[in-house]
Amino acid sequence: MLRAEKTSPWRGAYEFTVDGAPVSSFSSHWWRSGGRMTIDGRDHEIRAGRWGGTYTMTDTTDGADRVVATAERVARKHWTVTADGRSYRFRRASMWSSEQLLVEGEQAIGSIRKLSWWRGGAEAELPGLSLPVQLFVVAVVLSMWEQQSAAASGGGG
C-alpha cells in the first residue's frame, strides 16, 4: 500500500512510503500546481498546464526532460493517465467523495483516498502501475485536493 503523509501542516511536503518503507518525497509548489520528487535517485518535476487540467511528470536528471507520464482532464469526473505505453482511467467515486478510483472497463480495481481531512495525505492501492507512475498519480491527486481546498477557503464577498 502506498501512503503519502504530510510532513508539515504549513507546507505542501509529503513523505511517500510503501508498506512502511520510505520510497520518495514530494514537495509541491506553493504558487502553482505540481512539484518535485526524487525516485530511485532520479529527479522528477511535475508541472500543471495553464488551467490545471493537464499534468506532466518529466525526468529532469542530467537536464534530459524526458516525459514519464501525463494526466489529462484532472479534477473532472473521468480522467486519464498515460505512461509506460498504456492509458489508465480514473474516476471520482461519487459526487460527494474525494476518493478517486482506478477503473478497468466499469470495474474499480484500485483507489486513492484521503488519510485525513485535517492533516492531508493519501493512501493508494494502484495495481498494475509501476512505482513511478503510482507516485505521479498520487502527487497529482494531492495537488488537485490542495487546489480544491484553497478554492473552497478563498470565498469571500
Mark where each language-model region is.
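Intrinsically disordered, low-complexity proline/glycine-rich segments
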Residues: 1-157
